[in-house]
Amino acid sequence: MNYALSCWLANRAVPVGLNFAVAKSSKFFVILSDRKQSTYLTGEKMKKLFLIFVTLFLVFEVAAEGQESAPLRLVRTITLPPDVKGHFDHFEVDLKGGRLFATPESYKAVLVFDFKTGELIRTIGGIGKPHAVLYREDLNRIYVTDGDAGDLKIFDGKSYRLLSSVKLLEDADSIGYDAATKYLYIDNGGGDVHQTYSMLSVVDTTAGKKLADIKIDGDTLEAMALEKLSPKIYINNKAKNQVDVVDRDKRELIASWPVTKCKTNVAMGFDEADHRLFVACRSGQISVLDTQTGKEVTALAITKGVDDATYDAASKRIYAVGDGSVDVYHQTDPDNYKLLGTIPTGPLGKTARLVPELNRYFVAVPQHETTSAEILVFEVH
């Protein structure tokens, strides 16, 4: 079909074909019309049609600006092999080597990707239930907590060969790393071994040896955060809906703070400079605690089912990923926060990793129905 291109102003007659479209070009409205089948609209009808076009233009303009101003923009989708099923746990990144480590729990392996191309470059097998990964660049070693075996597995970062393992209790899960001492803190034990208490184990990652076990009442521990300027560790005690504070020099529990503004506290972000702890709960809130007093300051609404939360000090942003979306808040001051946006991911897409050095945010979305598991790569705006 041949089309004539016509741009018209105000009350002038406008040729309109039986099929027409409006396009945005240099802020003008363009009408595409069929020469052979055209009629003319003038006067009031033209004004009404013009108003419709203006309205459509504004809608599209606002939508476009909204995408550009969103805190995250999807730039890549990495599709995983169809046999990768079940939930994911935590990511790790090797910045120098350009690698992204992912932990599909039921796949009994850690997947290694080239984070620049999205290519799957290695599958590290022989892991019953991978939970968390630490990569030490100086030693080129990969440390993986295995919940089934109840140990910390240590792999060579070049050959991916298993070097050794450190025996823990079953359900070895979340970790916290002290870069100064090279000690890794691992929560393990609890309900999976039919105990009403859990262990926070201390492992020397250089020697590959366990140094101590710190007993904590409660059968389920989750994410933790370590202070750099003091020996404190803050740990989510999900069993008791509280935050436990451990002195890592004395290796003992020194305080417990109740979390009353939300339920099922699992994820955690930390703003050490402003003494704010962001305790993310699966009930759909973040409770903000003052680490100088242990008191709750405020609560922020987030998507339910959260599994990962992080605070970025440079941008003063909080990222919390729940069941199907990421909520991003900006910290205007230590007690006040503004929601920047809620970005959709996918069903049960609730584990993620912010990598400020790459300006990227990675989200794992499990396999669902006929759709394979995916890793979504967002650019941070």
Regions found by a protein language model. Name each.
Residues 51-61:
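Bacterial N-terminal signal peptides
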